[in-house]
Amino acid sequence: MKASMYLALAGLVLLFVVGYASESEEKEFPRELLSKIFAVDDFKGEERGCKGFGDSCTPGKNECCPNYACSSKHKWCKVYLGK
C-alpha cells in the first residue's frame, strides 16, 4: 500500500516536471527549476520588523504583522478575523 502511494506521488511529480519542461522555451530548464526551488532559502536571511503566523508574541504589545493578532490564550500570532 505504501509503495503504491509513493509510486503514484512520484508519477505525479514526474508528470509535473515533464509538463513544465515542455512549456519552457528556455534551454536552461534544470538550472531554472532548481533556482526556483531553492529561492525560498533567500527569504530566511531577511529580518522582519513584525512577527508572522505562528511566531511567539507577548499579548498587549503590537508585535505581530498586519492582519495578525497576538492570541492571549496561546501567545502566538494568529490571523485576525475582526472579532
Curated annotation (Swiss-Prot):
Keywords annotated in UniProt: Amidation, Disulfide bond, Ion channel impairing toxin, Knottin, Neurotoxin, Presynaptic neurotoxin, Secreted, Signal, Toxin, Voltage-gated sodium channel impairing toxin
Propeptide: 22-48
Record has Disulfide bond as a keyword: yes
Tissue note: Expressed by the venom gland.
SS bond partners: 50-65, 57-70, 64-77
Keyword Lipoprotein applies: no
InterPro entries reported in the protein's UniProt record: Huwentoxin-1 (IPR011696), Huwentoxin_CS1 (IPR013140)
Oligomeric form and interacting partners: Monomer.
Functional summary from the UniProt entry: Selective antagonist of neuronal tetrodotoxin (TTX)-sensitive voltage-gated sodium channels (IC(50)=1270 nM on Nav1.1/SCN1A, 270 nM on Nav1.2/SCN2A, 491 nM on Nav1.3/SCN3A and 232 nM on Nav1.7/SCN9A). This toxin suppress Nav1.7 current amplitude without significantly altering the activation, inactivation, and repriming kinetics. Short extreme depolarizations partially activate the toxin-bound channel, indicating voltage-dependent inhibition of this toxin. This toxin increases the deactivation of the Nav1.7 current after extreme depolarizations.
Name this protein carries in UniProt: Hainantoxin-III 2
